[in-house]
Design a protein with these regions (language model features):
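Class I SAM-dependent methyltransferase SAM/SAH-binding core
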Residues: 2-36
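Conserved Rossmann-like nucleotide-binding pocket used by diverse enzymes
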Residues: 16, 28, 40, 48, ...
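A short acidic, Gly/Pro-enriched loop at the edge of an enzyme's catalytic core
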Residues: 33-47
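Active-site micro-motifs of SAM-dependent methyltransferase domains
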Residues: 34, 54, 108
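GHKL-family ATP-binding catalytic core of two-component histidine kinases
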Residues: 38-40, 57, 102
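S-adenosyl-L-methionine-dependent methyltransferase catalytic module, highlighting the catalytic core
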Residues: 60-63, 67, 73, 77-169
Length: 169
């Protein structure tokens, strides 16, 4: 089973679309802030979620990740796409919630990182391996890698989207 969580009107082909709106053509109408989701434990092979997570606050993100972990099979991957924290897209939409999302936001969803950060007491149970990629602004991909790295760490609107791949441990 492959899920497109928060699919809106752009459900990914080959995926079961899940959204809270009955008007967007989702296959499953469900509010993803309401737990449990209508899927069995360890039943999902792949997840896609584009521009949904930024609409959740911190507590909702923790619950979302724990529920994501519950429904995913061990070794399953989830691609989560959000506006990058230094892009105007992260803050322009009044329905986006605080805080904006960076790579470091995901460290809380890895058990070893929670230990290193001394936050193992947080109410988070999930444990994902993490990998990241980003969508660069037009023209940035043509710069040499050292200049790209400098721009990413010093300039706004260099990276538009963060693409996080979470693998269930």
């Amino acid at each position: 089973m492959k899920l497109d969580l928060g699919c809106g009107n752009r459900k990914r082909e080959g995926f079961i679309g899940v959204d809270s709106s009955p008007d967007c053509g989702a296959d499953v109408v469900h509010d993803l802030t309401q737990m449990p989701w209508p899927f069995d434990d360890a039943s999902v092979d792949e997840v896609h979620s584009s521009h949904f997570l930024e609409h959740l606050d911190g507590a909702e993100r923790m619950a979302f990740m724990d529920e994501l972990y519950r429904v995913m099979k061990p070794g399953a991957k989830a691609l989560i796409i959000t506006p990058y924290w230094t892009s105007v897209g992260a803050i322009q939409d009044p329905t986006h919630k605080w805080p904006p999302i960076a790579e470091q936001s995901y460290f809380y969803f890895n058990a070893e990182a929670r230990q290193r950060l001394n936050v193992a007491h947080y109410p988070i149970r999930c444990d994902f391996d993490l990998a990241f990629d980003g969508t660069l602004a037009p023209g940035m991909e043509q710069l040499p890698p050292p200049q790209q790295a400098y721009a990413k760490s010093h300039y706004f609107n260099t990276v538009f989207e963060l693409r996080a791949v979470l693998t269930r441990r």
